[in-house]
Every structure is written in structure tokens, then in C-alpha cells.
Regions:
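Catalytic loop of the DD-peptidase/beta-lactamase superfamily, centered on the K-T-G motif
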Residues: 1-138
Length: 138
């Protein structure tokens, strides 16, 4: 390696099955199949807002209603305000999205291998999330 490149998600690969296990573990408060993977206290800390109110949120994945915890984006669940409660997850550069909603007791995983939409335009994957919420909560 001539010059190392630091990239938080660069080179991470997973199967859909393992992604489901991961999201299920997070939905269950850090436990999977009876084994404690991450403490509830750590998961709770990761889901607290860590970005100050003075930061412009226009460029966030989910607009001004979005926020950031430690390793997750945070988004108020439908019907909530910016103080929560929140769902949490991540949107990868290649199009993969996962959202865990402990309030409504479900997770959503959207697997794609695209980099931007047509001609490089950013994809609006929030449309998929909105459709899932509308189908489940109506």
C-alpha cells in the first residue's frame, strides 16, 4: 500500500442473511439467539443525539429531521417530533439501507448495488422507507 485510505465502511461486505441477523440483534436490544452481543447501555448511548443544534442538517440523509448518534443516523418515527422517539440505522454509499425501529418493533433492510441514481443523481431511498411504514402502520 503506497498511501493508506481511511474509510469507515470501505471494504465491508455482508450477506443478506447476516444483515438480517445484525438488524435483529439491534432490534432485540443487543441480544441475538440468547447471546448478549452488545450491552443495552452501549446501544442506548449509540442512539443518543450527538450533533449540536448549530449544525445545518440540510445535507443529512433524512433532511432537517435527521440526526446522528454514534454510528447510526437517527430519524423520528412517524408521528414523533425531533426529540424522538427515533428509529436508527445506516445508508451505505452503494445503496444498502437498514433501519431499526424499536418503537414499532420491526426492521427494514434494502439491499442494492448502485452508486447514485440515473446519471449519478442521488437516490431517494426514503421512498422505500415511507412505503414500508405506510403498509405496516395503516
Amino acid at each position: 500500500v503506497v498511501q493508506p485510505m481511511l474509510s469507515g465502511g470501505g471494504g465491508l461486505h455482508s450477506t443478506t442473511e447476516d444483515y438480517v441477523r445484525f438488524a435483529n440483534m439491534l432490534l432485540n436490544g443487543g441480544e441475538y439467539n440468547g447471546a448478549r452481543i452488545i450491552s443495552q447501555a452501549t446501544l442506548d448511548r449509540m442512539n443518543q443525539k450527538f450533533i449540536g443544534d448549530d449544525v445545518n442538517r440540510d445535507a443529512f440523509f433524512f433532511g432537517p429531521r435527521g440526526d446522528w448518534g454514534l454510528g447510526f443516523h437517527l430519524q423520528p418515527v412517524p408521528g414523533a417530533d425531533n426529540d424522538g422517539p427515533f428509529n436508527f440505522g445506516w445508508q451505505g454509499v452503494g445503496g444498502t439501507v437498514f433501519i431499526v425501529d424499536p418503537v414499532n418493533d420491526f426492521f427494514m433492510i434494502y439491499m442494492a448495488q448502485v452508486r447514485g441514481g440515473p446519471r449519478g443523481a442521488p437516490m431517494d431511498l426514503t421512498l422505500s422507507q415511507r412505503a414500508v411504514y405506510e403498509a405496516m402502520l395503516d
